[in-house]
């Protein structure tokens, strides 16, 4: 979906070119004012939901003089207090939107997944859009097999491109790699770490999360799109992990993403947000799609440390 701001701005420029006389000559300025007003409102709303910045980031450094960032991977580290845990720390690593294909080097995807395991995560979440074309399924299996492992498991949901391509084949590739799909249900983790459940939703393309979320559980939710955040927050979700947006994939320094595939425009384009009682983390993803190029938008791995600093 093209952002409303970009659409209105284009409309203003088009009107300015063709309307030069009469009362309608003011039309371009009215359209431009509407676009600027909408952009200002969206910035206010986004600021209201924005939460913490990463406590640190490791990887390729962003530079104004280096616009092409297609494979400039960065790992972002976040911390959230979670006193209900029975352990001092539960580390979650998230990857999203591999869009794995031969358009990017196989070695890039392998190195990206290896960097996830190198963080010694307790959990790994794979939040959808693993492939975009049927031809890439063998490559997906090659890259995934034997590569991802975490102390308490690796979990995944499918994304819209997975459903549009070959959902059953993607499920089989995930399963063969030892990855557990949580499409509309929950998996309870060992009681030794606390009351923690890992759940998934594949709405609106697949099954919606139907399992009730208990208020006393720490519920970690995989949702390919961040558009589900309002419903999930209302259901009592604790932390939601999403992708889908690619961070816009094409960004302008000082402005941000030009295009974000979300009903809420750029509101949840990338990073950490707080909606209701839920934390939301949105990954920019690892791959790129239409075009297979990133401009001022680095691919990322998100690492969230849920920390109990009150003693266990």
Which sequence ranges carry the predicted segments?
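Binuclear metal-dependent hydrolase catalytic cores centered on His/Asp/Glu-rich metal-binding motifs
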Residues: 172, 176-179, 191-231, 235, ...
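Active-site neighborhood of phospho(di)ester-bond hydrolases with catalytic His/Asp-centered motifs
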Residues: 93-96, 123-129, 153-160, 182-185, ...
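Non-catalytic terminal accessory segments
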Residues: 1-73
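Membrane-interface segments at or immediately adjacent to transmembrane helices
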Residues: 41-118
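Core catalytic region of metal-dependent phosphoesterases/phosphodiesterases
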Residues: 103-190
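Acidic/histidine-rich helix-loop elements
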Residues: 64-70, 95-108, 131-136, 162-165, ...
């Amino acid at each position: 979906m093209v952002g409303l701001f970009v659409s209105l701005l284009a409309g203003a420029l088009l009107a300015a070119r063709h309307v030069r006389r009469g009362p309608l000559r003011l039309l371009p300025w009215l359209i431009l004012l509407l676009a600027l007003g909408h952009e200002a409102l969206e910035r206010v709303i986004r600021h209201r939901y924005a939460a913490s910045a990463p406590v640190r980031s490791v990887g390729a450094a962003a530079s104004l003089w280096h616009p092409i960032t297609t494979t400039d991977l960065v790992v972002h580290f976040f911390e959230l207090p979670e006193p209900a845990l029975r352990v001092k720390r539960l580390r979650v690593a998230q990857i999203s939107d591999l869009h794995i294909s031969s358009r990017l080097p196989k070695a890039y995807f392998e190195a990206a997944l290896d960097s996830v395991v190198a963080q010694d995560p307790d959990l790994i979440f794979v939040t959808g859009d693993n492939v975009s074309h049927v031809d890439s399924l063998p490559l997906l299996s090659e890259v995934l097999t034997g590569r991802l492992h975490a102390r308490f498991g690796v979990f995944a949901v499918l994304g819209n491109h997975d459903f549009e391509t070959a959902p059953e084949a993607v499920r089989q590739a995930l399963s063969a790699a030892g990855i557990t799909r949580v499409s509309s249900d929950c998996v309870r983790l060992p009681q030794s770490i606390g009351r923690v459940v890992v759940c998934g939703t594949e709405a609106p393309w697949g099954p919606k999360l139907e399992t009730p979320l208990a208020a006393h559980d720490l519920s970690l939710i995989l949702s390919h799109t961040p558009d589900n955040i309002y419903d999930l927050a209302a259901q009592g979700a604790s932390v939601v992990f999403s992708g889908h947006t690619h961070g816009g994939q094409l960004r302008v320094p000082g402005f941000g993403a030009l295009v974000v595939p979300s009903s809420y425009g750029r509101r949840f384009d990338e990073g950490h947000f707080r909606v209701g009682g839920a934390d939301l983390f949105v990954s920019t993803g690892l791959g790129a799609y239409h075009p297979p190029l990133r401009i001022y938008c680095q691919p990322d791995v998100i690492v969230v440390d849920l920390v109990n600093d009150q003693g266990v």
